[in-house]
Amino acid sequence: MRFSLHLLPLLGGLHSLTEAKPLDQPSVTFLSPSEVSPGSAHNVIIEYGGSADGELTITYDSCDGAALVSSAKQRLGTTHVGDHPLAARHVDHDNRRPTKFVWLAPTDASELVGQSENLRVVKRIPRRSAKRSFAEVAGDDSMWFNGVAYLEQKEPDESFVAAAKSKSFGILGAGMSGLMSSLLLDSVGIHNWKILESSERLGGRFRTVYLNGTSPEEGQYHELGPMRFPVEITDSETNETFPFNDQRIVFQLADVLNELNAGNESVQVKFWEWIQSSPNAPVDSPFRRPDGTFPGKAEVATDPAYANPTVYHNTTAAAEAIAALDKFKGLDAERIRMYATNIFAAYTQAKEDGMFDYSEVSYLRDVIKTDLNTTDEVTPSHIYWPMWEYETVYFLATKWLTVKGGLSRLPAAFEPLMKGRIQYGAKVNGLHYNENKTVSVSWKPTGSEPFETPEEVESFDYVLNSVPLNLLKFWDLPPYSSLLKRAVDRTLFGNAVKVIVQFKTRFWEHLEKPIFGGCTRLTKPQLGQVCYPSWDLNATGPGTMLASYLSDYEATVACSMSEQEHLAYIKKALIRVHGDVVEENWTGNSARHCWEQDEHHAGAFTMQIFSQQDLYLPAFYQTQFNTVFIGEAATFTHTWTFSALESALRGTVQLLLDMGLVDEAKQITNTWMARFIEAALPPKPIYQTNNQINQTIEAIRNCQINNP
């Protein structure tokens, strides 16, 4: 909407090294912005029409009087351009004359502004009047496009001149956050980036294994990393279905990659249904069927003969403890909907409710004063974790999707976009901040002789670091702030081990009570999660299942066994579960991955203990020594693909704001950062491609043309 109709100009004041003289012709013409929002950040783009050497000051003032820099209403900033000695900082710009500047528009700019062209002032979404940190802006309302709170922390002239897009960018790690960052940089015309990846593959923890030399199309695979995406949830009482809005970014990414790779079927990303729960999947029970096999989920739920209620030493105390936890978490229908439709609002609510201040154990012991034995009985696996219940809500999903042919096909779709801008086998061991404000990255070839092999050193203007924090404990690092040092040193990572096994047939689909897809959890024997494939149902020939997925301490014990010893245990356990049909179909073809022993990760996922997350997160949201931290550890949810992608969005926007590239930061947030997160918006189709996505695709295509 329009406000009042007075005119206010943007003024460029140029002070030369010698006597100041009036200019016969304007040396500067203002090209943009065409409209502004009061109290928000904008880029001011100018064009030099003549000689411009000296101190340049840009101001904002009324058109009613003389255009005097000294009496201007607002000074945007001052820098030096052209032949001035202090203009050497702008060597990356043509003739040392930058053309893009940062303007934090005043909150009372309720008028039209402009000089050659009028600037239309538009109403923006109301914001809190109190100054907020970038972490707070990003954390609760996703309004990163504004950027004001972050830029206000900087000295005015420090953030005044926008950096040139020709700067160099190092991206450490080719997991999903690193890959996403490269895509985002390309989309805003920044192409001078390079990924350093310690392994020989893309995808990080995305790790699909195709057994026995098969192809994705043959279906003989399973996931040793992430497996699926929650899509929607149906309220069992109202029958209302609503989406997991945060997960839509995964499908939006697939849309963009598919369009960029149009015509190359081998890297198209397609989705099909994942079956998370199956009625006949075996469940933990002390009881057995007449044939000695484990009963299924539906049998245990409906047959009284399989009833096995939990027994507590003090039933009343246990019930009170469980009720206290449920009340504190408050996961009613309304809260579940908020978690699904607006994860940012859910995070804010969780902070306000104190969910990060306690684990289940500490809450019961310190607040409710529950006795130790009862506490231990009702909280078997929640000693350290905060009560941030997003994963609980994820697993209430009634519809799931996975990538056809395996999740590794998603990072594989980035391969055609690399264009030689990735160094595989580069194991980083340190960062050094130089006097010229560049960052040197030291690395050695992965697997090289450790004592005599010299280090390689590459320097970048900026670094996006997605390497798991626990690996950084052994790096040489710049003198980061105390908070960031502690975040690196003390953030914990959980262990996990997955084992997939190929069988001669899909025998589980031919049992008396057939199993079609689905996951279950078995602790006696110690298999953890077992997942039957959701694809190629009723197919002939061999089949592959996730035979064991253990995490935390159980994974540590399992990984202490040799792979063959562990496989023998799994075979024996599956025979107990399904009977001799396992022996009859056993091939021995298998794969195991112990994530804690993986030299590129040293852990499976972040496990920040209670009180750590809200303490450490702001440290990641501050750029230190031209380095921005991204990855699932550096965001407010963990372990899921969304976490990695969201961190890349935040980190790239943070970097662009550091560089003063406000327009580019807006472009990314308006394209990706989810107006669909707001619960008030109606659901969008999962595979929507809008004009903003098309603009992103076109920008990246231009990069491909310029980088053959």
Residues of each region from the PLM?
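Short, compositionally biased P/S/T/A/G/V-rich stretches that sit at domain boundaries
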Residues: L17-H42, L151-E158
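Fungal secretory targeting signals
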Residues: M1-P22
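Exposed aromatic-hydrophobic patches
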Residues: V81-D92
